[in-house]
Regions:
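A short, N-terminal "cap"/entry segment at the start of jelly-roll beta-barrel domains
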Residues: 4-7, 16-57, 70, 136-159
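Short histidine-centered beta-strand/loop micro-motifs
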Residues: 48-50, 61, 70-74, 116-118
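Ligand-binding loop in jelly-roll beta-barrel domains
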Residues: 109-135
Length: 159
């Protein structure tokens, strides 16, 4: 084999090795950093997925006066809520509790639950699903749209 061919073969193999190694190396994770209070208060959408990790998901929601999230059960997902603005009623397995700005609550997996806006202004909250519940990046402007086109988590994360 001539020197030129040998050099080309070695260079080609090295290039292939680098290419293959590069595909195995993942980019550094960035995570998610934001002023969640400001994002929650500015949000106008019924549901907006901000970040989806492998084991949890951050979502902001706005519930209009007189509306609710909708009675639901997540069999294998725990859910944390924090109310930033407004007032409402939380129902967990038929037990109702009043909730308002600065309240936080957790709904365990398997519990039937709903959040109803009982106030005159939009109810602004953020929620954390563990594990994720919705497809990453989903934005649903209204409750009707969210219920008509619900897209469950497909395994794809934000990063």
């Amino acid at each position: 084999m001539t020197t030129i061919r040998r050099s080309f073969a070695i260079t080609g193999l090295l290039g292939l090795a680098v290419l293959m190694a590069g595909s195995a190396i993942s980019a550094p994770k960035k995570g998610y950093i934001a002023n969640i209070e400001a994002l929650t208060e500015r949000n106008q959408d019924f549901r907006r997925v901000l970040y989806t990790g492998k084991h949890m998901q951050l979502v902001v929601m706005t519930i209009r006066p007189g509306e609710d999230i909708g009675e639901e059960v997540h069999d294998s997902t725990d859910q944390f809520f924090r109310i930033e603005k407004g007032e409402g009623e939380l129902r967990i397995d038929g037990v109702a509790s009043r909730v308002r700005s600065d309240d936080a609550f957790i709904v365990p997996a398997g519990a039937s639950h709903n959040v109803v806006n009982t106030g005159k202004a939009p109810l602004k909250l953020y929620t954390i699903y563990a594990p994720p519940e919705h497809r990453d990046g989903i934005v649903r402007a209204t409750r009707a749209e969210a219920h008509a086109t619900d897209a469950h988590f497909d395994g794809k994360t934000t990063e």
